[in-house]
Curated annotation (Swiss-Prot):
GO terms for molecular function: RNA binding; structural constituent of ribosome. It holds the Pfam family Ribosomal_L15e. This is Large ribosomal subunit protein eL15. Transmembrane segments: none annotated. Belongs to the eukaryotic ribosomal protein eL15 family. One of its GO terms (biological process) is cytoplasmic translation. It comes from Brugia pahangi (Filarial nematode worm). One of its GO terms (cellular component) is cytosolic large ribosomal subunit. SUPFAM superfamilies: Ribosomal proteins S24e, L23 and L15e. InterPro entries: Rbsml_eL15_core_dom_sf, Ribosomal_eL15, Ribosomal_eL15_CS, Ribosomal_uL23/eL15/eS24_sf. It comes from the Eukaryota. PANTHER family: LARGE RIBOSOMAL SUBUNIT PROTEIN EL15, RIBOSOMAL PROTEIN L15.
Length: 71
């Protein structure tokens, strides 16, 4: 199984120990960042490639915190 296939399987099984650990660590890291943060590469490279992402100049990726709840 290739690396992209392995990552894809991890995202499908969100309740696995590995995925729970990754999400917990990332959640903590994201809370330490500013509301709008420029990232060097996508969090899910296999999905980004499927959606047309290329690691060329001109592609800029930001992670933006969105408030949840309320009306």
């Amino acid at each position: 199984m290739g690396a992209y296939r392995y990552m894809q399987e991890l995202w499908r099984k969100k309740k696995s120990e590995t995925m729970r650990y990754l999400l917990r660590i990332r959640c903590w890291q994201y809370r330490q960042l500013t509301a709008i943060h420029r990232v060097s590469r996508p969090t899910r490279p296999e999905k980004a490639r499927r959606l047309g992402y290329l690691s060329n100049e001109g592609y800029i990726i930001y992670r933006v915190r969105v408030l949840r709840g309320g009306r």
